Amino acid sequence: MNLNLIKAGNNIPSDIYVIIEISSNSSPIKYEVDKQSGVLFVDRFIPTPMFYPCNYGYINETLSLDGDPLDVLVPSPYPIQSNVVINCKPVGILKMHDESGNDAKIIAVPNDKVSKEYENINDISDISELLKKQISHFFQYYKTLEKEKWVEIIGWGDHHEAKLEIKNSYDRAKKNTSLK
């Protein structure tokens, strides 16, 4: 399976494909897909005993400011296994910094064709306050026990900000590819 062949979506930035690396509620293990081979590697064991509150993945053909593809969190009724692609719509963004710089997280829910459960969720304001608190709490503290690692939560942005971040990351990747 070559995940590099997966496009960013059907209608960037409103209709995206998210490649899942980590299932929701999974153990504190940070997995990362090697972008060259498409193989899922263990990046590290997270010493803080916390689990991911949502499925965690990325949008192919994007380049965020930290030099990696754009990170995405996908709430779903069930955990989605790693190395699976899900069609989503972006609804918001968690703006944050870590030891490597800007590290935004897009919040995207399954597309209406994938799940009717999310058809009325179109903006971060439609996401429950509890889930938003769980997400920000996780990212605020999951690196606490790792030396020289830290996170600063800046705040939430709406679906317009999320789509702008996706578009900018997509354009950045296209520009970066054309420079090579």
UniProtKB/Swiss-Prot annotation:
The keyword Hydrolase applies. Catalyzes the hydrolysis of inorganic pyrophosphate (PPi) forming two phosphate ions. The gene is ppa. This is Inorganic pyrophosphatase. GO terms for molecular function: inorganic diphosphate phosphatase activity; magnesium ion binding. Substrate binds at residues 30, 44, 56, 142. Its EC number is 3.6.1.1. GO terms for cellular component: cytoplasm. PROSITE patterns: PPASE (PS00387). One of its GO terms (biological process) is phosphate-containing compound metabolic process. Keywords: Cytoplasm, Hydrolase, Magnesium, Metal-binding. Homohexamer. Mg(2+) 2 binds at residue 71. It is an enzyme of class 3 (hydrolase). Belongs to the PPase family. It catalyses: diphosphate + H2O = 2 phosphate + H(+). Its cofactor is Mg(2+). The lineage of its organism: Bacteria, Pseudomonadati, Pseudomonadota, Gammaproteobacteria, Enterobacterales. The keyword Cytoplasm applies. Mg(2+) 1 binds at residues 66, 71, 103. SUPFAM superfamilies: Inorganic pyrophosphatase (SSF50324). It is found in: Cytoplasm.
